[in-house]
Amino acid sequence: MEKLNETIINDRVETTLTTHDFYYDLPDELIAQFPSAERDMCKLMVLDRENETVDHKVFRDIIDYLNPEDMLVVNSSKVIPARLLGVTEKTGASMELLLLRMLDSGEWETLVRPGKRAKVGASFDFGGILKATVTDVVDGGNRVVRFDYDTEKYKTVYEVLDAIGNMPLPPYITKRLENKSDYQTVYAKEEGSAAAPTAGLHFTPELLERIKAKGVGYGEVTLHVGLGTFRPVKVDKIEEHLMHGEYFHITDEVAREINERRAKGGRIIAVGTTSCRVLESVSTPDGKVHPIDGETSIFIYPGYKFKAVDALITNFHLPESTLIMLVSALAGKEFVMNAYETAVKEKYRFFSFGDAMLIV
């Protein structure tokens, strides 16, 4: 696997589209606050690009749209309970720490609230179990912290987080999460995400087994989703928007199977925009996928030419977000925005815990 020392950034495509071109009106009651009672029984909207048709199904019907030569590519990143509530050791004042990413040093880049008093040397206590000390202040005001905990009781910091941390739910989910597993995919393995790769939440172990039994390939990549995924686009010209970098990797084995199946006429179906961004980051113009370990800030919007992804499973995204722009790049802006209007009329559930879309 090739190790990259620089962030993958794609060439920006010139476009006359503005951020507002991706706006749609969404009633608050359509923002899903809870997951479906059964993961694979949410609604599924199927967009057929060739015929420009829209079908309405349930998610477990997705198997009917998959061929034996196809391959599903999922993001196996695991959400960490990255929201910590504690007190400042000096004054006892309440504070919140949000973990953004682990650095090579083993320290963490974090967001501290309130942050004004979080100077280098400041320390915070979390229930007497975990202590955080600020070691640096970086661009944007984020704080780098060092953690201290009982290493005899907890083997890793992730075990500490599992014990005392809270899931970093998106701001549009206002209800308390009863079960942490509701915000994890059933195949989540590698800790590191600050948000779930939500397209994968609809799969159950049973549905995946049925899909594999049909002969459909299955491969896992990893992209650790950062909080930047919720960052709004604040510029009018979309090509001027700056994407945050996110760590990813794809193994030799997965890259090889993708290339083999595609060479035989199979489609590569990305499960989620994160898997899609990995595949497009590691592919060459001829569509070949390469095993790479690195960081990507690829920004996909209409005008982008897809190289590796043939179909996409995704959720319904926020207006004017980079994610709805990516979906529009694959299926066409007018087709997608019309489909979103239909979804509102048909009372689909939106965002992280909402319903799904398949683009073929």
Q: Where are the predicted features?
A:
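Surface-exposed, charge/polar-rich loops and edge strands
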Residues: 2-360
